[in-house]
């Protein structure tokens, strides 16, 4: 399975700067699987629309940031009168799903790829 976007597209067109090439490949694969599920696999792999590629890049970054948050532990930290709060993995996952769906609707909402009817 090929990813819907490659690293060159991520850098040059999406203008992404968060992920390196190796990380992008991992997260773009996860984003591609999510997009295939949400579009009922209607994207033609031989002619991938820019909206799909942009959405793939966007969701790749969102997934990376969620993974980073899972491993950092602290959601916020205060130095004066030291205070730390933690975000649960469930909250991080819920936020990722919400942000991914928002990206999906923003990029693909007018393409017909999300249509669930006959």
Where would I find each of the regions flagged by the language model?
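Divalent metal-cofactor coordination and adjacent catalytic microenvironments
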Residues: 1-118
